[in-house]
Amino acid sequence: MKLRYLLIAAFLMSVIVRPEMGAAQEFTSQKMVMEDARIGLEAGLFDAGEAIWNLRKVATVMPPENFVGVTNSDLAFKDQYVFQGNYNGVIIWDVSNPSNPVLVKDYLCPASQSDVSVYGNLLFVSGEGTGGRLDCGTEGIQESISHDRLRGIRIFDIADVTDPQYIHNVQTCRGSHTHSLLKDPDDDENIYIYVSGSAPVRPAEELPGCSGMSPSEDPESALFRIEVIKVPLDDPAESAIVSSPRIFEDLTAPPVHGPTDAERAEFEEAKARGEFVVSIGGSYFILPESYVAPMSAAYFGQEGITEPTAEDTMAFREALPDIIAQMMGGGDGADEDRGPNQCHDITLYPEIGLAGGACEGYGLLLDISDPANPYRLDAVADSNFSYWHSATFNNDGSQILFTDEWGGGGGPKCRETDPMEWGANAYFTIDEEKKMHFKSYFKLPVPQTDEENCVAHNGSQIPVPGRDIFVQSWYQGGISITDWTDPSNVVEIAYHDRGPVSDEQMEMGGSWSVYWYNGYIYSSEIARGLDVFELVPSEFLTANEIAAANTVKLEYKNAQGQPTYKWPPSFALARAHVDQMERNQEMNAEQIAGIRARIDQAEQESSQAIIDGLQRRMNRLRMSGSN
């Protein structure tokens, strides 16, 4: 029975005026909710209080021994496996039974951030810190120049996931803070890796060709560009950089917002205590010890200092703003009036030929139809945004959201005193000329404490047909699910949250990233391991919509790679569309009841036809067997 008449027509996009580039957008401010189950949760590392709404937590698993106390980072998925990055390496889980994830392999190979992606039998891992070694050793590297250092992409063969084989690496001048994997629909022989490096440029003595000079002084500068690696699938050991696109050309320094009054007071108190306070481009934040320690170790190592004196520590303190500025994309000297010199994340959507670049002070829309030569289609800036961090398209590519990692992820930015437009998401429509138009902001609607690092972070679309549903991490703000079908009116429809890791001081924790994969939602918890959730019916989401979403099956999924969700024909899909018609009051109750009755009848007839067909086949088999 054909059920095409059940499909809802595409949503009409309203005609809007594009805001002036760089201006703070006009928007009716979102209000913070002051009565919510997430407020006042008990603190604790593995025993914190929890609040959950319209979700069911099906599992939580702790990291293996060598990874406890070390930051868990991003996730990738292949078949029944979850690959979890960690600053100490990669953890591989078998989630054939999502309620009981089983540890398959903990591969010790330290490097920050160890963001991961997969394709076929290949695993790619980012390395950026100066302590990462080519041999995966745990002793680190103290020398300022070393040919044992890994800063770039590691490549593993995972034909046997229980025994990954390190087969190659591609070194880059600024390391790989994150990376994105691109499978071109028209190329089955190669894949491409877009590398976003945020570290200072390494010396040419360590990697020939690296230059940290301004492009005006050196056209081959490693600044103001990304790297594209081509990976031949029949010989991944030949992977190499094939281009370094300068997608930031002609961008000027974006507008910035300064600190709030509460922050100014907080910074002065922190300075008096001897803590590290840095100001980058008008944005201020206090660096947690978990950030300071590796930076100081790298600084002293590059200076050849094994036992720092008080004078050495003071020199590091003075150098820190410049170190952070290079990491966060700040200009220097002749380039201080230029725009960003790097991207943080680039979300690739090959099936529509577009990418969303979250590039420090700008959000970019890129054409990736030629994977080795992406180019910029549009750019937006906003003084409410401090650090454009990640991007997500809706399924048809008509909308895009960007996240703002105000403060770098290491500070509490979801307090009652923090503006709701800062550290939030910004939503845009994309017109036929591939220009982006601002619509609204959304931020976690409940206040978090001073002891909880909280700001907008990574997430993914959930394939509910006919709607744009997004699950997102907010560090210690937990995970939140929102409906952004109408980008001017984003609504929270589910959440999970824990209390702070500590109620005495700010300690890093919370959800680094969260993604939907084949019917379940997986969250990489920075300090606590891996959480697994499933959707439950609510006033915002029906059982039929959830069932239809779960008919979508992926062979693999990567954090910065966005697939087109496609729904196979099913009665769940038909019923989901009818539920949406009812919710949107597109038909009266009698009409809705009539359609549902016809679907029920069609399913019964279809089921009976299948049963009758099987019975006839069994009868034929019996008859042939008796002969």
Task: State the predicted function of each range.
Residues L7-A9, A23, D188:
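Intrinsically disordered, low-complexity segments enriched in polar/charged small residues
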Residues Q25-E603, I610-M623:
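Feature marking well-ordered beta-strand scaffolds used for ligand recognition
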Residues M1, V15, G613-L614:
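Intrinsically disordered, low-complexity regions enriched in serine, threonine, proline
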Residues R18-Q25:
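Signal peptide processing junction and immediate N-terminal pro/mature segment
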Residues L7-R18:
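Bacterial N-terminal signal peptides
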Residues M1-L7:
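Bacterial N-terminal signal peptides that target proteins for export
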